[in-house]
Amino acid sequence: WIMGHMVNGLEQVSEFLNLGANAIEFDIDFDQNGVAKITHHGIPCDCGRLCTKQTVFTEYLDNIRHVTTPGDPKFREQLILLALDLKLQRIPVEKAYAAGVDVATKLLDHYWQRGKSKARAYILLNLPLVQDYEFIRAFKDTLKNEGYEQYNDKVGVNFTGNEDLDEIRKVLKKVGVDKHVWQADGITSCFARGTDRLTEALKRRDTPGYNYAYKVYAWTLVKYSTMRRSLRLGVDGVMSNFPDRVVEVLKEEEFADKFRMATYDDNPWKKFTG
């Protein structure tokens, strides 16, 4: 999975897909009551990137629904995963549940259209910190209460704050999640980061019966050297400001026989077994 990073403007969707991304990540900014308002990162953000692009969240979902619906004039077959970077760290922790209800409801209304839409992308809910676990509970409660639990098949969760992997496992157990789990490891592209935690996450992914890391990805990679390093470790995905660079690296002799771009037929909730 090649994830285009910080794709918050509508015009950026095509831009990142044209560079080779098959997944996009966008930031969800909330008001203080936990209502998802806009796609927006804000300052500071990655080096060399404009941090201020934004779109009304529901408009973004309406647009991306077209892009991920087969037969739609805007359809782009390669876009198979949407990663929602939930900026929950900006709101009171007690509002995490309200935020989960709101995001689930907006996906139901504007992306899935309560069963009418044929939009097919998988959804990855990226939570910054384990303290926000009530968001997950609320999201699942809302799908159940509204009668659309079938969409759980399309949704996964991921904690992005580089917290202790055992703490993440405990929190996921607490909310009854033991499948559809990704694990991210990384840092803003402005800084270097070691591989200790990434290596540990990959080790857990490869441990039979471990259910709290089906896929592991590294973020936000901009240097060819760090892309190669992560691929050598065996990551499932890379998040980058430059998807075209990841595409280039994947074509190199060292990686061409070991990796390929994920397609819609690849289940993001299953461990890759070769």
Swiss-Prot record:
Organism: Sicarius cf. damarensis (strain GJB-2008)
Cofactor(s), by name: Mg(2+)
Active site: H5, H41
Cofactor: binding comment: Binds 1 Mg(2+) ion per subunit.
Listed name of the protein: Dermonecrotic toxin SdSicTox-betaIIB2i
Protein's job: Dermonecrotic toxins cleave the phosphodiester linkage between the phosphate and headgroup of certain phospholipids (sphingolipid and lysolipid substrates), forming an alcohol (often choline) and a cyclic phosphate. This toxin acts on sphingomyelin (SM). It may also act on ceramide phosphoethanolamine (CPE), lysophosphatidylcholine (LPC) and lysophosphatidylethanolamine (LPE), but not on lysophosphatidylserine (LPS), and lysophosphatidylglycerol (LPG). It acts by transphosphatidylation, releasing exclusively cyclic phosphate products as second products.
EC number: 4.6.1.-
Tissue spec. comment: Expressed by the venom gland.
Molecular functions per Gene Ontology: lyase activity; metal ion binding; phosphoric diester hydrolase activity; toxin activity
Intrachain disulfide bonds: C45-C51, C47-C190
